[in-house]
Amino acid sequence: SVKDMLLSENTLYREAAYRAAVHPMYIEWVFRKFSERIEGAVFLKDLEGVAREMIRRYCLLVQHHSLAGYSQVIRDAINYIDSHLHEAVGLKDIAESAGVSVSYLAARFKRETGQSVMEYINGKRILDARRYLAVTDMPVAVVGEQIGIGNGNYFTKLFKKYEKCTPREYREMMQAKR
């Protein structure tokens, strides 16, 4: 049946994403969403375009989250960071999770990614903040808390460093584009 074929494709794409060294957290979320959608379909027309959308979503997943070019230590560090991004994440915690010393992690991370651990963390947090600011009306301080930065002034300063505008100005620009 069409459902069985799509469920098989979903499983194959999931396996390919694992081979591309994408964190299981991301893979399983996409896999589960497609499985629920396929299994919940009542009519054949409910499944139109699902195969194409699956290919697109899994390709984007690999494109944005593949860690295939990194050593296992850096993969472990990035996976830990991504899983704890909205908490107070310290270099010591990350190094412990990867089973290496702080100095080794810092040097290796910089060598393999081209940025420091904190630059990576802050970049990811600012990316999340941009999403919140673009689609919600949350107060700026709350957005900062949501991304793991409890100090509103520090959040604004960091956001301005990365985006060349304040969070409030960014939100206004995004609202003007709607």
Q: What kind of region is each of these model predictions?
A:
Residues I121-R130, E169-R178:
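Short, basic, alpha-helical segments at the C-terminal edge of helix-turn-helix-like DNA-binding modules
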Residues L85-H86, L133-D137:
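Short amphipathic helical patch at the helix-1/turn junction of helix-turn-helix
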Residues I55-V62, V102, A106, D128-A129:
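Juxtamembrane/interfacial segments around transmembrane helices
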Residues S1-E87, E96-S97, E172-R178:
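Inter-domain helical "communication" segments and dimerization helices
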Residues E9, E112, A129:
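DNA major-groove recognition helices of helix-turn-helix
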Residues A88-K124, M138, G144-E169:
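Basic/polar phosphate-binding segments, predominantly the helix-turn-helix DNA-binding elements
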